[in-house]
UniProtKB/Swiss-Prot annotation:
Propeptide, residue positions: 1-57
Family: In the C-terminal section; belongs to the purine/pyrimidine phosphoribosyltransferase family.
UniProt keyword list: 4Fe-4S, Glutamine amidotransferase, Glycosyltransferase, Iron, Iron-sulfur, Magnesium, Metal-binding, Purine biosynthesis, Transferase
GO molecular function per UniProt: 4 iron, 4 sulfur cluster binding; amidophosphoribosyltransferase activity; magnesium ion binding
Protein name stated in the entry: Amidophosphoribosyltransferase
Single Gene Ontology BP annotation: purine nucleobase biosynthetic process
Function: Catalyzes the formation of phosphoribosylamine from phosphoribosylpyrophosphate (PRPP) and glutamine.
Length: 556
């Protein structure tokens, strides 16, 4: 598919708050105890926040390793997964008798220090770095979430993904008395609902059995790590939308959203956790149980943009996939030029592949400020546009007087490409040929990526393909524009099309979407507001916002 025509800010360091749960008398500054009936939530008072970090999707990590510094291992694992979530970070550890949870808004390096990590002793830990898919960016919504099961027992949980039946699960929690009617809830995420239902089910059985009963009723994309005082659990939804891998340490086991998270702690890759599989790891080893039949639909955008290039997905190198996409893009959308440059970092491998295939020289035409986060995940449009200028700067001596092929990973809103084309022209480029290493993004994602409403997607302006391409080209100001085909992108992944989700490109969603449920980021906030007005959760269906509606349905 090719058209040719003639012409982050560092968050302030918050005062850290430790929640020690599982032993009476160990809770700090309890200010409310209002939300979950027999499973009380203890909220530590939060300092004032002024948070504007960039966003990505979440990363989860877990380790079971007696005799190891599990909190530090988890810290390093989260460091490797920082690109997946930059709003908040947290770690939970357990030593066989209690669970300790520490979390705050900010990057992993902002939330944790040596003193904090040294105080978190145990043999099992989970960690989470957050990008919000459901619920606002608040301290309460940081993870891991914690719920009491019984006196001296509890469960901590971290979640990567996004559920599509949150309203249904919240109604079930409400019917069980797990959601307060009028008192503001300390957390408003689908992850919090899962934690509440899991703890509620474990009150009358084991945590493992409660999970096996709950998970088949959960719909959407989810990779979970959760734990009690002794055991680490990890599971993946039946479609395997998001990645999750198992690794081996000399004295234990590790799970991580990406294999790069295993590498950083010296764990050897064992295998991917299968779709529909629950793992339990304790002193008896690793137990595997199927809670649903697998129907693999891995997110193809993980290959294009989300995952680290040094990770592998379903046995395929992410870096290798991106280079191959670039080669195919060169064959599908050739153009005469003097130099190929990539938009760092995720556009660089595809640019290398394009240069290799086309025979046109590759050069570094853009410098990236490593301390500014990704742009399509910034919390507001104004900051997105500012962030592009902050993060990229052209090397004028490299590009002046040249015809450039500029390779980027994707076009969502078009802000990056529009600002980039303007900068490169000002720096002296005589022609700008933009090539995109993914097809046009035309549909929102309901499974955990920050794609906006259809009206905000630049490729969704018109239905006709050629008119759309011309509209996007004009919108970003390029001389020519070319996208790789859907077929070419899938072929580069070396995965069968039947095992991938590419709904953001073709609108075919593998996981059934509820016809009436509000799928927006603030679905739980809306439900609580309805309850405050006297409307019951069972009345919510009549008050839902339709799937193609207004700004309340921010597509996540």
């Amino acid at each position: 598919m090719c058209l040719a025509v003639g012409v982050g800010v560092r968050a302030p360091k918050h005062v850290p708050q430790i929640r020690r749960l599982g032993r009476a008398g160990r809770r700090l500054r309890c200010v409310t105890n209002c939300a979950l009936g027999s499973c009380p939530i203890v909220t530590v008072q939060q300092p004032g926040r002024d948070f504007s970090s960039p966003r990505e999707e979440c990363g989860v990590f877990g380790v079971w390793a007696p005799g190891e510094l599990v909190a530090k291992l988890t810290y390093f694992g989260l460091y490797a997964l920082q690109h997946r979530g930059q709003e908040a970070a947290g770690i939970a550890v357990a030593d066989g008798s209690q669970v300790l949870v520490f979390k705050d808004l900010g990057l992993v390096s902002q939330v944790f220090d040596e003193q904090t990590l040294a105080a978190m002793e145990g043999h099992v830990a989970i960690g989470h770095c957050r990008y919000s898919t459901t619920g606002d960016t608040t301290w309460e919504n940081a993870q891991p979430v914690f719920r009491n099961i019984a006196a001296g027992s509890g469960v901590a949980l971290g979640h990567n993904g996004n559920l599509v039946n949150t309203a249904e699960l919240a109604a079930r929690a409400r019917d069980a008395g797990l959601i307060a009617k009028r008192c503001p809830a300390p957390a408003t995420t689908d992850s919090d609902i899962l934690g509440a239902l899991l703890a509620h089910g474990a009150a009358d059985s084991t945590l493992e059995q409660a999970a096996l009963e709950l998970l088949p009723t959960v719909r959407g994309a989810f990779c979970l790590t959760f734990m009690d005082e002794n055991t680490l659990y990890a599971c993946r939804d039946p479609y395997g939308v998001r990645p999750l891998s198992l690794g081996r340490l000399d004295r234990g086991w590790v799970v991580a959203s990406e294999t790069a998270g295993l590498d950083i702690v010296g764990a050897s890759f064992v295998r991917d956790i299968e779709p529909g599989e629950l793992l339990a790891i304790d002193a008896d080893g690793v137990r595997s149980t199927r809670f649903a039949n697998p129907t693999p639909k891995g997110c193809v955008f993980e290959y294009v943009y989300l995952a680290r290039p040094d990770s592998t997905l379903a046995g395929r190198s992410v870096h290798g996939t991106r280079v191959e996409i670039g080669r195919r893009l060169a064959r599908e959308c050739p153009v005469e030029a003097d130099l190929v440059i990539g938009v760092p970092e995720s556009g660089t491998p595809a640019a290398v592949g394009y240069a290799q295939e086309s025979g046109i020289s590759y050069g570094q035409g853009l410098m990236k400020n490593a301390y500014v986060g990704r742009t399509f995940i910034q919390p507001s449009q104004t900051i997105r546009q500012l962030g592009i200028r902050l993060k990229l700067n052209p090397l004028k001596e490299v590009i002046r007087g040249k015809r450039l092929i500029v390779v980027d990973d994707s076009v969502v809103r078009g802000n990056t490409q529009r600002a980039l084309v303007r900068m490169l022209r000002e720096a002296g480029a005589v022609e700008l040929h933009v090539r995109i290493a993914s097809p046009p993004v035309k549909w929102p994602c309901f499974y955990g990526i920050d794609f906006p409403s259809p009206a905000e997607l630049i490729a969704n302006v018109v239905a006709d393909e050629e008119e759309m391409l011309e509209a996007v080209r004009q919108g970003i100001g390029a001389d020519t524009l070319g996208y790789i085909s859907l077929r070419g992108m899938i072929a580069a992944s070396e995965q069968p099309a039947s095992r991938l989700c590419y709904a953001c490109f073709d609108g075919r969603y593998p996981i059934e979407l509820p016809s009436e449920a509000m799928l927006g980021k603030n679905v739980i906030e809306h439900m609580l507001a309805n309850a405050a007005r006297g409307a019951g959760l069972r009345d919510l269906a009549a008050d839902q916002v339709p799937v193609d509606a207004d700004e309340n349905c921010v597509w996540r």
